[in-house]
Curated annotation (Swiss-Prot):
It catalyses: adenosine(37) in tRNA + dimethylallyl diphosphate = N(6)-dimethylallyladenosine(37) in tRNA + diphosphate. SUPFAM superfamilies: P-loop containing nucleoside triphosphate hydrolases. Substrate binds at T17, A18, S19, G20, K21, S22. The record marks T106, R128 as: Interaction with substrate tRNA. The keyword Mitochondrion does not apply. Monomer. Signal peptide: none annotated. It comes from Caulobacter vibrioides (strain ATCC 19089 / CIP 103742 / CB 15) (Caulobacter crescentus). Belongs to the IPP transferase family. This is tRNA dimethylallyltransferase. The keyword Nucleotide-binding applies. Residues 40-43, 164-168 are annotated as: Interaction with substrate tRNA. ATP binds at G15, P16, T17, A18, S19, G20, K21, S22. Keywords: ATP-binding, Magnesium, Nucleotide-binding, Transferase, tRNA processing.
Amino acid sequence: MESSDIASRIWLIAGPTASGKSAYALDLAERIDGEIVNADSMQIYAGLRVLTAGPSQEETARAPHHLFQIVDPALGWSVGRWLEAATQALAEIQARGKPAIVVGGTGLYFRALTHGLADVPPVPETQREISSLLYAARGETEFREILKPLDPEAEARIESGDRQRLVRAHAVAITTGKSLTAWQTDTKPALAPGSWKGLVLDPPRAELYARCDARLAVMVEQGALDEVRALETRGLDPALPALKAVGYREFAAHLRGETSLDQALDAARQETRRYAKRQLTWFRNQTPDWERIVP
């Protein structure tokens, strides 16, 4: 590839937690003189660098990093806000004539870049509640039969057990008279086709789980408990997105004296593995054409 092509190309590097994607992205950035943009919904928050495996000072000194630890945990964040910030960062990087490397594990961020973000009208809270109650009353199988004539593509696409997305698809169709799939089809991608290359790091399952376990031990050594303790003293709403970071709830329970450290670590290991499995499933289903890399 010519140097001009490398500079203009945007690299999208995705993968499950602990797959080694951050190290891969940093190595690539050093080789091609690129800049890194965060695509992880938890690494966006300040004060959780260790718990979310964000880049260290040594790593940020090796290549420019953008959109890491920029939002206070007391504040919310959304795909739309990330997309706006990311597209601005990408434009600035390319204006400097540098390659841009977007790395993270939040699939919806990558989808927003490559498929666009649907401008769906707000759904009233009352309709969300009605759709949720309908799901609870009828169960998933019958709810899917109700959703199918409203949005057959969404019904077929949404995985079993994904109540939130099923309920949203129903609520959007009822509120707007137009299926969520139709809204999404009408969107334009933020990145032009051909301007980017997608890679998914896909280590063997056993190796990935071993990496997850090892990472948790390192997090404790590097101060993850101190990060959780600092946020707990602020009395933040447990429903805030930042406090849903994998491991936060388990370590917070330990700090409150509800569990031993070993129990907290065991619970965090299980949650980390479940999270990694969900990510693997998402990237397998949503990015089938991206190149797979075995680290």
